[in-house]
């Protein structure tokens, strides 16, 4: 019996982050660029490049609490944006996971208002106040992302991920963390302009997409390589769960063809999220994918969680400071148990795999 494909959420770029957001409204948001936001009592990561030993730059921050878990949960992806480092495999890429226990909203309100005699209607008006000192609509209460139930539509992540975009400018600033919000690493690192991430369900694009552009790209690929991709694909078996078998062919790449065909529905996607699902490979998977190391914290198995997509590359360029990050796709694997020891104050390092873009010009 064919396995059921797990739902996929797509991350898309949206509005710019203004100023230095503080409090839960900052760390319950997902974004591209800027500086990492700290969870309460947990330090922000400050990784260094394994090649040049310089501080890494934040690429994305993803707020993704798991279904049924009592923890807030943040994932950070860092890369070296200096020339020659950003495409030097995973030595220049790092992934970290931070968590902290959620405090029920009602308990928080009661603790802060023990001596107050506010009317019930006032409590209702303020019950969604997350402590932001801006007038923006606060994000909804934390919910869950990634569970065995796969009830993706109910996930708060689809509402919290608000947008992502990078201009051809970069910053070299560090926003101070408000007292008590988290432990920060005061390092001035070149930063990409921060943007929020918004989310859509991949299946929503299936019936409305115009495939003309994708078809023209594939025709060009077939002409240049002198191959018939449909014929190549027929050489491999297909059991419905997208296992992406390795097919030995004289030329052409059926895995790349599948990748192009799948993303044609939403070419602007910069992130694909599918907890414990199947990654969308850009090229035939290497031993790194089949031999993902165990979690360094609990020794348990890691599982695929999300990947960064080629459309993100052009958003991470900077003409001013010469910063650039190049990749085809970045596959992120995290602890399947999402372990977090009591009183843990340091982020847990996770694992990522870099696949280079075999035909970079196709994504321009």
UniProtKB/Swiss-Prot annotation:
Keywords: Acetylation, Cell cycle. Residues 125-150 are annotated as: Disordered. It comes from the Eukaryota. It holds the Pfam family PDCD2_C. The modification N-acetylalanine is found at residue 2. GO terms for cellular component: cytoplasm. Over-expression suppresses AP1, CREB, NFAT, and NF-kB transcriptional activation, and delays cell cycle progression at S phase. This is Programmed cell death protein 2-like.
């Amino acid at each position: 019996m064919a396995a059921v494909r797990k739902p996929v959420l797509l991350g898309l770029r949206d509005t710019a982050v203004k100023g230095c957001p503080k409090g839960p409204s900052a760390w319950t948001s997902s974004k591209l660029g800027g500086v990492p936001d700290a969870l309460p009592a947990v330090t922000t990561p400050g990784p260094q490049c394994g090649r040049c030993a310089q501080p890494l730059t934040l690429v994305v921050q993803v707020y993704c609490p798991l279904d049924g878990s009592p923890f807030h949960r943040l994932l950070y992806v860092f890369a070296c944006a200096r020339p020659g480092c950003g495409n030097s495999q995973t030595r220049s890429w790092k992934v970290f996971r931070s968590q902290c226990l959620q405090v029920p909203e009602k308990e928080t309100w009661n603790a802060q208002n023990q001596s107050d005699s506010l009317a019930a209607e006032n409590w209702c008006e303020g019950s969604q106040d997350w402590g932001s000192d801006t007038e923006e609509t606060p994000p909804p209460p934390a919910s869950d992302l990634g569970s065995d139930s796969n009830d993706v539509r109910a996930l708060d992540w689809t509402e919290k991920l608000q947008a992502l975009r990078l201009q051809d400018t970069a910053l070299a600033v560090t926003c101070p963390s408000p007292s008590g919000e988290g432990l920060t690493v005061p390092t001035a690192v070149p930063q990409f302009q921060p943007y929020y991430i918004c989310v859509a369900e991949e299946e929503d694009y299936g019936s409305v997409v115009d495939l003309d552009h994708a078809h023209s790209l594939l025709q060009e690929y077939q002409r240049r390589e002198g191959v018939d991709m449909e014929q190549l694909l027929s050489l491999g078996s297909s059991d419905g769960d997208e296992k992406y078998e390795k097919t030995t062919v004289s030329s052409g790449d059926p895995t790349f063809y599948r990748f192009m065909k799948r993303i044609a529905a939403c070419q602007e996607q910069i992130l694909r999220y599918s907890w414990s699902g199947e990654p969308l490979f850009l090229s035939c998977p290497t031993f790194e994918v089949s031999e993902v190391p165990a979690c360094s914290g609990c020794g348990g198995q890691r599982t695929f969680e999300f990947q960064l997509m080629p459309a993100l590359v052009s958003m991470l360029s900077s003409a001013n400071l010469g910063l650039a990050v190049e990749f085809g796709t970045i596959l992120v694997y995290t602890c399947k148990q999402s372990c977090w020891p009591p009183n843990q104050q340091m982020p847990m390092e996770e694992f990522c795999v870099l696949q280079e873009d075999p035909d970079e010009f196709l994504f321009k």
